[in-house]
Each structure stands twice: as structure tokens, then as C-alpha cells.
């Protein structure tokens, strides 16, 4: 994969972030209209044909969309500004003090100084497996997190390559881009889960209250619409996640002038990337290699369309030819 300049990659990711911020409200609006149309179609007896159905749909959409957009906006603001603590809790990470490991601080500081970057925060996951990730949306929240295993089992050159990989994510602004996509997908996931659980509860109480039939239909329609949104938003998120790994590998090779060290690190990481605390798929894609069992099977079917990471063998091969 051809590597592009830092400024070009930053500009591209800033543009993509802007496009996501524009496309997401549009997707929400389209899905809201679809929900209104389906609801009118299945619940209202229309004696005046398609025109009246569309008129009623338009009126319901106009009445409903301000509340939908308002709720989504509140969710986005909360998730956007609390993402660091959410990710830390989801991965079991904690701050790594300088006195605990001066070696790591020296490696990070030297790389940051060579690139003119501000020093990020450093966290550690107390897990013997090998993995790492970058997170944050600005200089105040940028963080590099390393597992205990990756610190102990990689030599300095390999660890420098991994750190450079994560610093490239930060420098290229693709950490922020990915977090925005994660927040968006999370909204659809939450709506689908709420609708699914509500349908289950309503169907369970149906025998006691036949009036629940209409409510169940509404919830089923909401679940279908939310699932459609989740599907397309997830595809977009996965595509962003896969490409960013190639770019970060190339950036790390350029930063350290030692692509073979990162290739060696990836080989060791691929042998044991599983982080026990990580259960959420959206958080898993932040890591240098998928930290769960899907690391071995994510590429099966549809040519890896639903994979969060590209094949690590391909990444290693590219680095060896860099």
C-alpha cells in the first residue's frame, strides 16, 4: 500500500471526520422517515391511496425528527467527551507511572521529540498477552496503552515500532476519526438492543394484555430500522479501521527507519493478542491486532468485509518490502 505524506493523511482524516458528521444525521433522518412510512403503512387504514400515506408520513416525520436529532445529539456529546474513561474501563487499563517503567517513557519521549509531537499519556493493561492501542480526541486526551505482556516480551526495537505505530494513529488524526465512527455505530446498536428487549418483554406479557399487539409492531419496526442503520454504519467503521492499520504500519516504518522491527513485533503479537478484559467489538478495533478470538476468524466470508483488521500476514509482508 502506498504511503502518503503526514499533512495529506491528516487532511484526509479531517475531511472524513467532517463527512461522517454530515452523513450520520442524514442517515438518521432517512431511517426515521422509513420508520414513519412503515408505521403508517402497517397501522393506518388508508382509503385515499398512496398520496395520503405519504402525507401522513411527512407529517409524522416533521413532528418526530426534532426529538430524534436532539436525543442523538445528546448521546453523541456525552459519548464524545467521555470516550477516554469508557475505553479505559472496557480494556481494564490504568495509568503507567514513570517510576514503574522508565524504559517505556524513554522510548515514547524519544519518538515524540524526533517528530515534534506532544507526549501522550501512557496506560498499561495488566495482561500477559501482547497488544496495544491509541485513544483520545485531542492533545489533552491522547493516550497510548500497552499490555504488560507486550512490554515484557518485546525488545526495545520491536517495542519502539509498536509505539511508533500508535503515535502514527495519533499524528494522523485517525484515532479521532475512528472514535467518531464508534460513537455513531453505538447509537444504532443501543437502539436495536432497546427495541429487541422491548419486543421480548411485550410478547411475554401479551397474554395478559392484547393491546400490546400494536406496541409490539412498532417496536419490531423500530428494531428493523435500527438494524439497517447498524449494518451500514458498521460496514463503514470496519473499512476505516482496516485501512488505518496499513497507514499506521507505514508511518511507524518511516518514523523508526526500521520496518523489520515492527514486522517482528507483529509476528509475536499475532501469537498471543487476546486481552481477557476486552469484550466489546467496537473497542477491540482500536488495538494493533484484534484482542479476541475473532483475530483468527474475522476474515472468513465476504472477503473480510466485516473484519476489523487486515490480515496480519499481509501487513508483515508489506513491512518486509518497505
From Swiss-Prot:
Protein's cellular compartments: Cell inner membrane
Residues that, per the record, bind Zn(2+): 165, 169, 245
EC number assigned by the record: 3.4.24.-
Gene3D superfamilies tied to this protein: Metalloproteases ('zincins'), catalytic domain
Pfam families: Peptidase_M48
Superkingdom, taxonomy of origin: Bacteria
Keyword match Metal-binding: yes
Major localization listed first in the record, in broad terms: membrane
Cofactor: Zn(2+)
Residues spanning the membrane: 19-39, 61-81, 175-195, 216-236
Cofactor comment: Binds 1 zinc ion per subunit.
Gene Ontology CC, one term: plasma membrane
One BP term from GO: proteolysis
Enzyme class: hydrolase
Active site: 166
Disulfide bonds: none
UniProt keyword list: Cell inner membrane, Cell membrane, Hydrolase, Membrane, Metal-binding, Metalloprotease, Protease, Transmembrane, Transmembrane helix, Zinc
GO MF term set: metalloendopeptidase activity; zinc ion binding
Membrane topology value: Multi-pass membrane protein
Family: Belongs to the peptidase M48B family.
HAMAP family: Pept_M48_protease_HtpX
Protein's name according to its UniProt entry: Protease HtpX homolog
Amino acid at each position: 500500500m502506498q504511503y502518503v505524506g503526514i499533512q495529506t493523511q491528516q487532511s484526509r482524516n479531517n475531511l472524513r471526520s467532517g463527512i461522517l458528521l454530515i452523513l450520520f444525521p442524514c442517515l438518521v433522518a432517512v431511517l426515521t422517515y422509513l420508520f414513519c412510512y412503515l408505521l403508517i403503512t402497517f397501522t393506518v387504514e388508508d382509503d385515499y391511496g398512496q398520496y395520503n400515506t405519504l402525507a401522513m408520513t411527512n407529517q409524522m416525520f416533521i413532528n418526530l425528527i426534532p426529538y430524534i436529532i436532539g436525543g442523538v445529539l445528546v448521546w453523541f456529546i456525552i459519548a464524545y467527551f467521555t470516550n477516554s474513561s469508557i475505553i479505559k474501563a472496557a480494556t481494564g487499563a490504568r495509568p503507567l507511572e514513570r517510576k514503574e517503567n522508565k524504559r517505556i517513557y524513554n522510548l515514547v519521549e524519544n519518538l515524540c521529540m524526533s517528530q515534534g509531537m506532544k507526549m501522550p499519556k501512557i496506560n498499561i493493561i495488566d495482561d500477559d498477552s501482547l497488544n496495544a492501542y491509541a485513544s483520545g480526541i485531542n492533545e489533552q486526551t491522547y493516550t497510548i496503552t500497552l499490555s504488560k505482556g507486550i512490554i515484557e516480551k518485546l525488545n526495545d526495537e520491536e517495542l519502539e515500532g509498536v509505539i511508533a505505530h500508535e503515535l502514527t494513529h495519533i499524528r494522523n488524526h485517525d484515532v479521532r476519526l475512528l472514535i467518531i465512527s464508534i460513537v455513531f455505530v453505538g447509537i444504532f446498536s443501543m437502539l436495536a438492543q432497546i427495541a429487541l428487549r422491548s419486543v421480548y418483554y411485550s410478547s411475554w406479557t401479551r397474554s395478559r394484555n392484547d393491546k400490546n399487539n400494536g406496541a409490539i409492531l412498532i417496536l419490531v419496526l423500530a428494531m428493523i430500522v435500527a438494524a439497517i442503520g447498524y449494518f451500514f454504519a458498521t460496514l463503514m467503521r470496519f473499512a476505516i479501521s482496516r485501512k488505518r492499520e496499513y497507514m499506521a504500519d507505514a508511518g511507524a516504518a518511516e518514523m523508526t527507519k526500521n520496518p523489520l522491527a515492527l514486522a517482528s513485533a507483529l509476528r509475536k503479537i499475532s501469537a498471543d493478542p487476546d486481552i481477557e478484559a476486552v469484550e466489546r467489538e467496537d473497542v477491540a478495533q482500536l488495538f494493533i491486532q484484534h484482542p479476541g478470538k475473532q483475530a483468527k476468524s474475522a476474515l472468513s466470508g465476504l472477503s473480510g468485509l466485516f473484519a476489523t483488521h487486515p490480515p496480519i500476514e499481509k501487513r508483515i509482508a508489506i513491512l518486509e518490502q518497505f
